[in-house]
Amino acid sequence: MHERLLTAAIEYDKGDPKRIQHFIKVHSFARLIGKQEKLSDEMMKALETAAILHDIGIHEGERLYGRNDGEIQQKLGLVIAKEILESVGGYEDVAERVTHLIARHHTYTDIDGKDLQILIELSLIHISEPTRLLSIS
């Protein structure tokens, strides 16, 4: 279902395997947890889509402002996500919710749905990801 979107996101983040691996992990866990929580089909589609695109504003934030904190990700990410969703097509039914989720995935108050709760928690996955490989002799 999301193959074209995944391909577009991989192309957008080309040259940044850390970001690509992160959104693939977040998407995989979002799909698993969403199914376990028995989310509706529409909510699943929005959650999975937002999981793929949730950090899409990072590169633009670094380019424009020299930073990529949550505020920047939320602000720039929703604009870039809209463009990608329009170019890929097939997401008109969830585009508004997806951009809402992206615009709030670093806002930890007023959580308005299970999809947002799941995305917020999963976006924290990167905290436990190693930033470099260590050699143990």
Q: What is each residue range found by the language model?
A:
Residues 2-25, 57-67:
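Active-site flanking loop/helix segments enriched in acidic
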Residues 2-6, 27, 74-78, 82, ...:
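An amphipathic alpha-helix signature
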Residues 16-47, 82-88:
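Alpha-helical phosphate/pyrophosphate-handling elements in metalloenzyme active cores
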Residues 22, 54, 73, 105-106, ...:
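Histidine-centered active-site/metal-ligand motif
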Residues 44-63, 77, 99-106:
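His-Asp-centered metal-binding catalytic motifs of divalent-metal-dependent phosphohydrolases/nucleases
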Residues 59-96:
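Helix-adjacent hinge/juxtasegments
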Residues 90-128:
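Histidine/acidic-rich helix-loop-helix segments that form or flank divalent-metal centers
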Residues 126-137:
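Single conserved hydrophobic/aromatic residue that forms the stacking wall/gate
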